[in-house]
Regions:
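Cap/lid segment of the alpha/beta-hydrolase catalytic domain
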Residues: 93-94, 98-174, 183
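Short alpha-helical segments and helix-capping/turn motifs at coil-helix boundaries
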Residues: 68, 81-85, 106-112, 189-190
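C-terminal His-loop and adjacent cap/lid subdomain of alpha/beta-hydrolase
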Residues: 92, 194
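Acidic, low-complexity proline/glycine-rich segments
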Residues: 1-6
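Non-catalytic accessory segments flanking enzyme active sites
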Residues: 7-90
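Gly/Ala-rich beta-loop-alpha elbow adjacent to hydrolase catalytic centers
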Residues: 184-188, 192
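Residue in the alpha/beta-hydrolase core beta-strand immediately N-terminal to the catalytic nucleophile
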Residues: 179-181
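Conserved hydrolase catalytic core segment
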Residues: 197-201
């Protein structure tokens, strides 16, 4: 049966409503627990050992940007590994960064990259199927086998990986960690939403 009004996020389990800013953190945790139970499943905590190595770098767009391939590792014995493609302005200082989960074989177009650079932003993309298949086989992929015992599906797995991209950005000297965005297309949009629910950065 369809609902005609969106649920009230400020309605607490006891029937009262959040009235102050101080009450919100507890309500947020309640909502996250509901989403974990009914929608996303359980997922492992941040591994704490995320690292990134630049394996390729060159100037692009007539020298006004730098393109890099970044190999990210994390998890027990660095069992989780995947590659990202980064475009960033070739200038000193910190810049906002867009993190973009992509489908296999898809990357930002030159027009999209040019628009990002014109705003002074960086963009870092990764193909999410490196971590989990876009099918029922996700439960047999690299993340699921590295972290057994969790009830997550592909959406949560990809979202967890998008947060590991943010872990890497935090180790760089160019990412403005107060201006990080998660995005994706179609199911990728659901992934970005999941990532931002569980990662407050």
């Amino acid at each position: 049966k369809a609902i005609h009004e969106l649920p009230d996020p400020f309605l607490k389990p006891d029937g009262t409503r959040v009235q102050t800013r101080e009450e919100w953190p507890e309500q947020r945790e309640y909502l996250k627990a509901m989403l974990t139970h009914y929608l996303y499943g359980t997922m492992p905590p941040p591994p704490g050992n995320t690292r990134g190595k630049v394996t390729f770098s060159r100037k692009v767009y007539n020298g006004r940007a730098i393109a890099e391939t970044v190999h990210i590792t994390c998890g027990p014995k660095d069992a989780v590994q995947f590659d990202c493609e980064l475009i960033r302005p070739a200038k000193e200082g910190k810049v906002p960064v867009i993190t973009w989960n992509q489908f296999k074989g898809r990357h930002g177009s030159p027009d999209e990259e040019d628009a990002v650079l014109n705003h002074g932003y960086a963009i870092i993309e990764f193909e999410k199927e490196q971590l989990a298949a876009d099918s029922a086989d996700a439960i047999h992929g690299p993340l699921a086998t590295t972290y057994p015992g969790y009830t997550w599906g592909a959406i949560a797995m990809w979202a967890w990986a998008q947060s590991r991209v943010v872990d890497y950005l935090a180790t760089t000297d160019y990412a403005d960690m107060n201006r990080i965005v998660a995005t994706g297309h179609s199911r990728g949009g659901k992934v970005a939403l999941c990532a931002t629910i569980y990662d407050e950065r």
